[in-house]
Amino acid sequence: MRVTYLAGAIALGVLTLAPSAANARVTRADVDDPTICAIFDAANTWDIETSDIAAKKGSTKEVRDLGAMFSRDHKAVRQQGRDLVKKLHVTPTPPKDFALATDHAQAMKQLESTSGKAFDRAYLTHEVAYHKAVIDAINNSLVPATKNAELKDLEVKVGPAFQAHMLAAQRLLDGMGQ
């Protein structure tokens, strides 16, 4: 299966640092509930990691605060997913071709090697694209492919939070101007 920059919460594909929504498509035939659980966990973990960097390296208080909020929110959502996995006695199974791990490593490398306003722009651009890809994957691929009602409910429940994250990052990015 090829999901490209959309883990845990679901979708990821990095062109420079931004996930590609086109590459984030997951077909129903590609995933089952254990795979969805693994993707859900990875997507949240990876956004925690990028956001932890922003909480430390952001050049403005707004970017640092956004990174801290995103990290906190994704830790809570990841824990909800892990609690559900335990309750359902599911063993998360990462996709066979989990290229997302490579994509995430590239994003982390770029964020770690950037600073100042360039870091802020790279992080915010990444977060907007990442959350767009995740929202697309949740709505168009994961929810339709999910068999378990509780897992589907969790995916649907986190959708508005992903939307809010995307809009918050977009507002800060728009405020940066050119």
Put a short name on every predicted segment.
Residues V3-G8, L17-Q178:
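His/Met- and acidic-residue-enriched segments that coordinate or traffic transition-metal cofactors
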